[in-house]
Amino acid sequence: MSIKQIRNIAIIAHVDHGKTTMVDQLLRQSGTFAEHEKIVDTVMDNNAIEKERGITILAKNCAVTWEGTHINIVDTPGHADFGGEVERALSMVDGVVLLIDAQEGPMPQTRFVTKKALALGLKPILVVNKVDKPGARPDFVVNAAFDLFDKLGATDEQLDFPVVYASGINGWSSLVEGEQGEQWGPDMSALFNTVLKHVPPQQGDPAAPLQLQISALDFSTFVGRIGVGRISQGTIRPMMDVVVMEGPDGKPIKGRINQVLTFQGLERVQSLEAGPGEIVLINGLNDIGIGVTITDPVTPAPLPMLKVDEPTLTMNFCVNTSPLAGREGKYVTSRQIWDRLQKELQHNVALRVKETDEEGIFEVMGRGELHLTILLENMRREGFEMAVSKPRVVMKEVNGEKHEPIELVTADIEEQHQGGVMQALGERKGDLVNMEPDGRGRVRLEYRIPARGLIGFTNEFLNLTRGSGLISNIFDSYEPHKGDIGGRKNGVLISMDAGEIFTYALGKLDDRGRMFVKPNDPVYEGMIVGIHSRDNDLVVNATRTKQLTNFRVSGKEDAIKITPPIECTLEYGVEFIEDDELVEITPKSIRLRKRYLTESERKRAGR
């Protein structure tokens, strides 16, 4: 394969703008799926949580061949919480395809990845997707994208970007606008040809000393650690002697490559050699980490290490100490939790883990609430049992002054909900930056708000907008501390003893607040069973039964009516709790509890 026949592109899109569907179409139309093969939808989101939530978490690769050119496609996460994945994915490509919904326009998460791509000097190709939607406004999207690039400091060359109109779900693309309701182009060839024309081919020299930077890691029980990266120059072959270096100042560690694999469709195919521009997987080296350079032992040419954004949120992961501990989980000890977190660090670069002074409690720092709850959800599905504390933001000290992370929030809401949302964001120390009505009864609000103010806001936002609002946020900068933000408005109902919940007890508590539990659920002293209708905590008896006597009551007894409980998901629990509370996570249940279970312990701690 000559060098000119390779193109490496990344696809950038906001959640639900149709990126994964678009990749499905590119794979189909390039003939990657043979006629007899079963075509799976959303091939790129192959992790169980990704399929359920419809979000991309891990940066993944696939490759298609179009008119003799090998195109490597790198799928990037659209969410700022996975910034670590985004930066590494972009280090492997020469151009980016920015996919934007023809109705919604550019969103904050798109902005995050686009800013990174433009800063690296990558040239964008704009794809306006879903142009067949009834509310599509392609002209608005193209202008909004131009303004966005300009704001993010794009060069004149980057601002002269090609535009492709497409409908990913129907499998067509076009370079010119057509009539609404009609098909504007025959197939995806317009997009393929634009990529070949505008993405520069790799310029590396195959005869130069090898230079391969590892951008992602994988693990296989058969061959051990697998490194994924793009060859900048030189040629790599199986059984070749190399050195591994952590940047120009790193110490060279000798090693030997075992296998070299390249991407073909979604498959990994063994290769006898690979040259500049190819994205390869290699194994046989145990000392590889993210950002290291694999280079020639005689004339090493290491690249600088990849820079990843610092974490902004921290949580404590603790051993589960509740009376129900060990009943539902397979892995419950602090050693098992610690080992699992160390394993996660091998490929989750934006994560930090450290031990605390207290035994069985580890401090885990990440890029945001979603980043950490996805890790918890993965651990829970693997059979882990633990408790976690309320998330806290990571503060910085600048010139002796306390600084905190500020987020940029975009809320798309109906005009009737505008007052309530603005009041709630104001209470959380948010500053309104921009307000833009779309002329169709909806309005877009842009706020700058402390990251602390967003913890627990998602649930409140959904209630305020009756589920019709869209909100997304992105880290902006560190600024001086903005002062105290009020906590939760309601207190909680706390169980006074252990046992099973009875319908009779719930009936008596119905007017006290909303419940998290249902009849026959096990409870223990100190467990949170509901939200109190007032602002104080209340200890209640959720296990009481009706006293039976030998008197018969005239008339039929009234049936007990109870309100259905609030479903407590992992995200809801983490957002809901206060500093003196924990979320207990097991493979089967999510429970909320007080940190100190008995009332006497709570009083002592509160002094």
Residue ranges and their predicted role:
Residues 25-26, 63, 85-88, 92, ...:
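Alpha-helical scaffold elements adjacent to nucleotide-binding pockets in ATP/GTP-utilizing enzyme cores
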Residues 123, 133-196:
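Canonical P-loop GTPase G-domain recognition
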Residues 1-100, 104-106, 144, 217-220:
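P-loop NTPase switch module centered on the Walker A-proximal segment
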Residues 322-345, 559, 563:
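A short, contiguous, amphipathic alpha-helix enriched in charged residues
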Residues 211-315, 325-327, 490, 498-549, ...:
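Conserved nucleotide-binding/hydrolysis modules and their immediate coupling elements
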Residues 4-18, 80, 106-115, 121-123, ...:
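Conserved structured catalytic cores and adjacent interaction surfaces
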Residues 38-42, 152-164, 202-213, 249-263, ...:
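Interdomain boundary/hinge elements
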Residues 16, 22, 54, 73-75, ...:
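Residue-level signature of catalytic and energy-coupling elements of molecular machines
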